[in-house]
């Protein structure tokens, strides 16, 4: 996976994917790894931890999948599922596991 800024579509909606060093959080005790802004159609993925160390690729990939799943639920109007963080995280981890087994690959 090439972790660089790009755009992609979920059906007819274009999202901008941005990889950033830091994502500001209202809670200083937590670290936000990713965000999905449904009004601006922007997904941000944090690439460095609080100490400035690069986050490993596996965690970046799961975070990317997690945020894409949020966008999928939002675009499909599955707003209750979108708010279910354990469901979103579980789905992301399951997809990553299937991708690692090369069950889900591009053409």
Question: Residue spans of the language-model regions?
Answer:
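Short, Lys/Arg-rich amphipathic alpha-helical interaction segments
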Residues: 100-107
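Active-site scaffold of zinc-dependent metalloenzymes
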Residues: 2-58, 71-75, 79-94
């Amino acid at each position: 996976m090439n972790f660089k800024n790009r755009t992609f579509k979920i059906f007819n909606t274009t999202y901008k994917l941005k990889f950033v060093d830091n994502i500001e959080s209202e809670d200083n005790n937590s670290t936000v790894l990713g965000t999905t802004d449904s009004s601006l159609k922007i997904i941000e993925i944090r690439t460095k931890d609080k100490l400035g160390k690069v986050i490993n690729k596996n965690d970046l990939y799961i975070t990317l999948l997690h945020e894409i799943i949020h966008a999928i639920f939002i675009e499909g109007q599955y707003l209750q599922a979108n708010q279910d963080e354990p469901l979103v995280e579980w789905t992301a981890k399951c997809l990553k596991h299937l991708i690692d087994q090369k069950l889900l690959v591009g053409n």
